[in-house]
Amino acid sequence: MRLSALLALASKATSSPFYRYGMSRPGSIADKRKNPPWSRRRPVVVEPISDEDWHLFCGDMVEILEGKDAGKQGKVVQVVRQRNWVVLEGLNTHYRYIGRTKDHRGTMIASEAPLLHHQVKLVDPVDRKPTEIQWRFTEAGERVRVSTRSGRIIPKPEFPRADGIVPETWTDGPKDTSVEDALERTYVPRLKTLEEDVMEAMGIQETRRFKKVYWY
């Protein structure tokens, strides 16, 4: 694991109470355009689901239950936990124009619209049909998803992150900081100042005598 990933996990992002999550990555140009600092957008009511109960991840094969693409199966390519959204590759699409100017109508592209978590279901790998799941523990203590109909374990898929890295298959390179080195405690707190530490390390003896200073 890279040191930047560890620092990202340690950081805590804070957002405005009027901030509204969307399809764009938080902090991107498109997100800043939709959420300017002066905007006061009405908050969106979202069904609270804990991280322990959430069971849809990028790379999962699911089937759509509602909408124009009901009955079709596709792969989850994006999950927006703050809105309970999932985006399927090539499904539930709508068409829009980009690059529109005064003299050019723009280019029409297909864009996937998000679906709520209750509008899709995981596909059972045994019969390729939608199924309910339960979280259970294996004999080794691993928490897995189990189909309630067939009892088959549905493993979490290995899906690359935004930078193209699959954490489960990543191997550290010569320029990567290992987890052991990043977590190693090398700093020893001391009451001395930086100047006193440098003088002690270099063997510098202070021979000057400072005059008294009075504070009024």
UniProtKB/Swiss-Prot annotation:
The modification Phosphoserine is found at S24. Its main location: mitochondrion. Residues 56-89 form the KOW domain. It holds the Pfam family KOW. It is found in: Mitochondrion. PROSITE patterns: RIBOSOMAL_L24. Residues 1-9 form a transit peptide. SUPFAM superfamilies: Translation proteins SH3-like domain (SSF50104). InterPro entries: KOW (IPR005824), Rib_uL2_dom2 (IPR014722), Ribosomal_uL24 (IPR003256), Ribosomal_uL24_CS (IPR005825), Ribosomal_uL24_KOW (IPR041988), Translation_prot_SH3-like_sf (IPR008991). GO terms for biological process: mitochondrial translation. GO terms for cellular component: mitochondrial inner membrane; mitochondrial large ribosomal subunit; mitochondrion. GO terms for molecular function: RNA binding; structural constituent of ribosome. The keyword Phosphoprotein applies. Keywords: Mitochondrion, Phosphoprotein, Ribonucleoprotein, Ribosomal protein, Transit peptide. Belongs to the universal ribosomal protein uL24 family. Component of the mitochondrial ribosome large subunit (39S) which comprises a 16S rRNA and about 50 distinct proteins. PANTHER family: MITOCHONDRIAL RIBOSOMAL PROTEIN L24 (PTHR12903). NCBIfam families: rplX_bact (TIGR01079). This is Large ribosomal subunit protein uL24m.
